[in-house]
Amino acid sequence: MGWSGSPLTLPPLRGSPPLPQVERDRTQPQLLAFADAFPSEGRGELRSRERRGEATGRGGLRMTAPTRPLGHLYLVATPRPGQSEAEFLRRVEDALAGGVDTLQLRCKADSGQYGEARPYIALAERLRDLAHARNVPFFVNDRVDVALAAGADGVHLGQNDLPVEWARLMAPGLRVGRSTHRPEDAARALAEAPAYFATGPVHATPTKPGRVAAGLGYVRHIAALRPTLPWYAIGGIDLGNVQAVLDAGATRIAVVRAVLDADDCAAAAHALREALMVNG
């Protein structure tokens, strides 16, 4: 059963310019998916969650209190084409065992089956369980609806995603992270005061094709600001170049391929964690 009510909208933010069309186009499908992901026949499961003592937000959707500490080695877990879900989950679990202490699930609209809300939510719930078993905070990329439905700790938003304030209005129980790519992005992030922000890409990476690398100079710029918010250097970071990133002033890093595509995910995570601890 799909959503059959009137169009879903959010109110304009006081003192804010109108939302650009690209962001309006991205927001409406999220709101529709949010309404469609839990039709009336699914309410019994939501009531079961409540009986189990799981906190819920408005509408019965579970929301997680921000109690799990942000770590220093952040894995952005992205399912690989042709990779089975079991293999993906095994690699993520190994990475957590090796020392990953903050986890994000990133599935974009073109990510095969995970482009749809229900499979995305189901996968997010599996990763949430793996993360929470180790008291690791779990974030969902881009999708506030999926983060809420899956009981994630938070949502990570890019520059073309929802404004942080809108995400807070939709889901006051979620922590919100933000991507930044240049000094003006960082200035906005500091004003928005998200739970954390990411800086990069430090190096060119196939994870973000076509995006010009921000370079180590951007890392130095952020470090010189001495922000009180946690921040992560991200983009093409691996064991071979992590020391230069740390020397530029970063104390936290986010990675994808360096861990998830390694022959031994646990060993790769452990080596990066050791580098962070030595420089901590």
Swiss-Prot record:
Catalytic reaction(s) noted: 2-[(2R,5Z)-2-carboxy-4-methylthiazol-5(2H)-ylidene]ethyl phosphate + 4-amino-2-methyl-5-(diphosphooxymethyl)pyrimidine + 2 H(+) = thiamine phosphate + CO2 + diphosphate; 2-(2-carboxy-4-methylthiazol-5-yl)ethyl phosphate + 4-amino-2-methyl-5-(diphosphooxymethyl)pyrimidine + 2 H(+) = thiamine phosphate + CO2 + diphosphate; 4-methyl-5-(2-phosphooxyethyl)-thiazole + 4-amino-2-methyl-5-(diphosphooxymethyl)pyrimidine + H(+) = thiamine phosphate + diphosphate
Alphabetized SUPFAM superfamilies for the sequence: Thiamin phosphate synthase
Biased composition annotated in UniProt, kind: Basic and acidic residues: 42-55
Domain of life of the organism encoding this protein: Bacteria
Gene3D superfamilies cross-referenced by the UniProt entry: Aldolase class I
Any one GO cellular component localisation term in the record: cytoplasm
Coiled-coil region(s): none
GO molecular function, one term: magnesium ion binding
Binding site for 2-[(2R,5Z)-2-carboxy-4-methylthiazol-5(2H)-ylidene]ethyl phosphate: 205-207, 236
Keyword Metal-binding: yes
Binding site for Mg(2+): 142, 161
Family as reported in the entry's similarity comment: Belongs to the thiamine-phosphate synthase family.
Name by which UniProt lists this protein: Thiamine-phosphate synthase
Organism the protein comes from: Deinococcus radiodurans (strain ATCC 13939 / DSM 20539 / JCM 16871 / CCUG 27074 / LMG 4051 / NBRC 15346 / NCIMB 9279 / VKM B-1422 / R1)
Gene: thiE
